[in-house]
């Protein structure tokens, strides 16, 4: 395995994508806009598309309103009132952490849109915002289950048709290569579905490699695979390796709560330099050799009660184990949340979150968040605001695109299937459980701290050799009928995601944002650019200057 060559032409490395005429399905629908994914970004996209009068279908891998990281827990929100000084401070606060790869114009756009939507969530969605002691309404965080319950109600009232437990398996394109819908499988009814649409919004989440973090069982990089199969590019994939702190006996990751913690070696001595924001690497290195313990200090009784009310599921595992985290030490681990709290994803080329493929839009964790955060987020706040904003922009734009096609063209154009790896093998189909081996190979290269957190050229090349061999194997034989097709596609998506991640990581020979190179520990000003990547059988990487998206699209 050799390092990716730079630069490489994007157009010359796009894979051929239209491989088969799409077959009719058990459930065959048409819509103006299809949204893939039912989390915050997906529901905002569906809502805003429907408000324009568009006919909208939303397909969720789980049950829309209860599946995914946000619905399972909750999150902070990057909500800053329209005060110039406050917003300048909020934007400047993360510039260095993100490696100066963000775009201030986009950050201001996100703050504007998030402010508007959070006001709307209370006034029109009935969300019960809490009040501060002085009576001010506090909109800096949402209780996930309540937030997503209300989002489901809102899109239903707007006329959106929801397909629950209906994972998408592939995108559809027309004869020109424009995205024209998607196809998938309804798990509970055990039947196929197809939606022919004027435009598609990818809001399927990022990739956490089935690490066990709460709510991340449905985010396996599917959207990135779908996008690559139709020729879209990815951006910031080297920034897809975020590890979050959790109690050893818990799947709940709450960085803000652990900011109140003190960390200890296994022998009880203080772990110097450890912290949930600046100092997680210290914890990760220690975990390579010993157990690490934490205790939530510096929290008064009133704050303890507030924390329990705000995120009760954080404390449930402690209660079950008879541990008071405020007075007792407890063992911790770090769970990979990959691009969920990272910034890598599908490349965006316009202000309305269009991709480079006509008819395809990306929102939330499916899309790159470099424009807002550069190479580091570290938590839900910025990503939550991005989900709200990008979903809004993508939903409205998808509706406009569909209207521009005209109803007749939208309904009558022939469509072609694009799914390859895990659906249509190039050789003899393998064992029905082959996906299990493929998943474990991907997890084995993506999860370990010494491979993905503390990166070196040698270790990344070794991982890529293993992943490339696995990709060749799955392209040749991986497939499964009916409900199991979801598993084979997840296996293919995680393998592809890891290959893109390490290929971009090899190309960035410096430490910037969350991308840490043991062999290149310093930031290199000469590498102040973003990295685009893509390709399926042959992965490519090329640098992109840091400049506004509107300029990139012109």
Predicted regions and their residues:
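Glycine-rich active-site loop/strand segments that organize a redox cofactor
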Residues: 78-110
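Mobile, glycine/GP-rich and aromatic-enriched active-site lid/loop segments adjacent to catalytic centers
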Residues: 3-6, 115-116, 121-169, 238-378, ...
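N-terminal Rossmann-like FAD-binding beta1-loop-alpha1 element of flavoenzymes
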Residues: 33-58
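Glycine-rich loop(s) and the adjacent beta-strand/alpha-helix scaffold that form part
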Residues: 199-251, 370, 374-397
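Core beta-strand elements of the Rossmann-like FAD/NAD(P) dinucleotide-binding domain
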Residues: 28-31, 189-199, 356-357
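Long, amphipathic alpha-helical stalk/connector segments used for oligomerization, subunit docking
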Residues: 401-484
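Extreme N-terminal leader/targeting segments of oxidoreductases
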Residues: 1-33
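Glycine-rich FAD pyrophosphate-binding loop
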Residues: 51-72
């Amino acid at each position: 395995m050799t390092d990716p060559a730079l630069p490489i032409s994007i157009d010359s490395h796009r894979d051929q994508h239209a491989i088969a005429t799409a077959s009719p399905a058990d459930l065959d629908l048409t819509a103006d806009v299809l949204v893939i994914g039912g989390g915050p970004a997906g529901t905002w996209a569906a809502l805003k598309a429907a408000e324009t009068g568009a006919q909208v279908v939303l397909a969720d891998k789980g049950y829309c309103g209860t599946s995914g990281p946000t619905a399972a827990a909750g999150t902070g929100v990057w909500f800053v009132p329209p005060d110039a000084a406050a917003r300048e401070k909020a934007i400047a606060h993360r510039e260095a952490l993100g490696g100066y790869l963000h775009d201030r114009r986009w950050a201001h756009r996100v703050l504007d849109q998030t402010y508007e939507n959070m006001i709307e969530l209370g006034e029109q969605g009935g969300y019960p915002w809490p009040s501060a002691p002085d009576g001010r309404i506090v909109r800096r965080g949402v209780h996930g289950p309540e937030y997503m319950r209300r989002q489901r109600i809102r899109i239903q009232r707007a006329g959106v048709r929801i397909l629950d437990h209906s994972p998408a398996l592939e995108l559809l394109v027309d004869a020109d290569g424009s995205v024209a819908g998607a196809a998938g499988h309804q798990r509970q009814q055990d039947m196929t579905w197809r939606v022919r649409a004027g435009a598609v919004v990818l809001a399927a989440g990022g990739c956490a490699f089935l690490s066990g973090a709460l709510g991340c069982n449905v985010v396996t990089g599917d959207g990135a695979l779908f996008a690559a199969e139709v020729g879209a590019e990815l951006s910031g994939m080297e920034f897809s390796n975020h590890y979050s702190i959790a109690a050893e006996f818990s799947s709940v990751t709450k960085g803000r709560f652990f900011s109140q913690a003190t960390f200890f070696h296994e022998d009880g001595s203080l772990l110097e330099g450890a912290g949930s924001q600046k100092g997680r690497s210290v914890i990760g290195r220690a975990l390579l050799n010993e157990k690490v313990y934490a205790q939530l200090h510096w929290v008064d009784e009133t704050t303890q009660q507030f924390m329990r009310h705000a995120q009760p599921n954080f404390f449930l595992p402690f209660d079950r184990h008879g541990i008071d985290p405020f007075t007792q030490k407890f063992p911790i681990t770090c769970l990979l949340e990959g691009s969920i709290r990272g910034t890598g994803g599908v490349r965006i080329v316009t202000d309305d979150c269009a991709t480079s493929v006509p008819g395809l839009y990306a929102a939330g964790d499916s899309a790159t968040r470099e424009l807002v955060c550069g190479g580091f987020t570290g938590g839900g706040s910025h990503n939550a605001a991005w989900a709200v904003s990008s979903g809004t922009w993508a939903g409205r734009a998808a509706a406009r695109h569909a209207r521009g096609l005209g109803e007749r063209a939208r309904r009558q154009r022939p469509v072609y299937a694009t799914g390859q790896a895990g659906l249509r093998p190039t050789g003899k189909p393998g064992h029905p459980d082959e996906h299990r081996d493929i998943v474990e190979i991907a997890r084995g290269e993506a999860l370990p701290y010494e491979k993905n957190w503390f990166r070196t050229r040698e270790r990344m090349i070794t991982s890529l050799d293993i992943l490339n061999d696995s990709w060749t194997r799955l392209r040749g034989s991986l497939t499964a009928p009916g409900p199991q097709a979801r598993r084979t596609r997840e296996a293919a998506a995680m393998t592809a995601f890891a290959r893109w991640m390490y290929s971009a990581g090899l190309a960035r020979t410096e430490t910037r944002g969350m991308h840490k190179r043991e062999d290149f520990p310093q930031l290199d000003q000469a590498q102040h650019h973003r990295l685009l990547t893509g390709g399926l059988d042959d992965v490519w990487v090329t640098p992109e200057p840091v400049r506004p998206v509107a300029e990139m699209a012109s």
